[in-house]
């Protein structure tokens, strides 16, 4: 009988290398928020991948960056804390970009960990094969990696192969979660992240990091209908106007797109009500950050 493997795997990397895309690809559901804007992942998102012979819990950390405010400090603390008490680390980089100072900063952190570190070069669909080997050799000159695997999370290229390689390094163990559980976050958290994703897609560069979403109420009104009320927090009146849009058009579009994804997540019809409120300088208010769901692990 084949042994059952289980383990916790941390995904770390600079902003926008495709960590959330990878998590959503291997889980088969949208759990982690995806956007082309940096720093969109704020909490550790645990995606649970269950196969017949293994269960892998992926922890998608906020992208490593230099903090600019209290929320940034929190995001960095989460990323670093995630490196402890796990079975493997995926260091994800863009195959189509030069090695940057952010990558070097992460490599210096990783040199001190005893956990197996896998270098995963993402976005190989954007790179000519001849360019791949020199990039791999360049990374190898910085440190010894347990394994190096090129993938495309968006296209699904080589992802299954990477999972097979990863499994060989994980310990034997039981299933930590039921077969049908794909995340350890409550549904309300995932719903809030879906709403935030739609705002990021529809608004300009001024808005992204000033957006916080809190799901105030989520009630199953009948077997096939869920009523959700959520508040979108911004820092300035001008941002409130951008999110709402002329005649409320932008907010309606956010609601329409979010409702579609939430209905797929919950398997029910959804009645979604959204409000936009100004909470000045909220990213520097620790208590407010906690109030809207960004909570550090307690030691």
From Swiss-Prot:
Compartment annotation: Cytoplasm; Cell membrane
Gene3D superfamilies for the chain: 3.30.300.20, P-loop containing nucleotide triphosphate hydrolases
InterPro entries xrefs: G_ERA_dom (IPR030388), GTP-bd (IPR006073), GTPase_Era-like (IPR005662), KH_dom-like_a/b (IPR015946), KH_dom_type_2 (IPR004044), KH_sf_prok-type (IPR009019), P-loop_NTPase (IPR027417), Small_GTP-bd (IPR005225)
GO biological process terms on file: ribosomal small subunit assembly
Domain of life: Bacteria
Stretch list, region G5: 151-153
Region spans: G1: 13-20
Ranges for region G4: 122-125
Membrane topology: Peripheral membrane protein
Renumbered residue ranges of the record's region G3: 60-63
UniProt signal peptide: none
GO molecular function, one term: GTP binding
Domain annotation Era-type G: ranges: 5-172
Keyword GTP-binding: yes
Family: Belongs to the TRAFAC class TrmE-Era-EngA-EngB-Septin-like GTPase superfamily. Era GTPase family.
SUBUNIT field: Monomer.
Protein name as catalogued: GTPase Era
Organism taxonomic ancestry: Bacteria, Bacillati, Bacillota, Bacilli, Bacillales
Name of the encoding gene: era
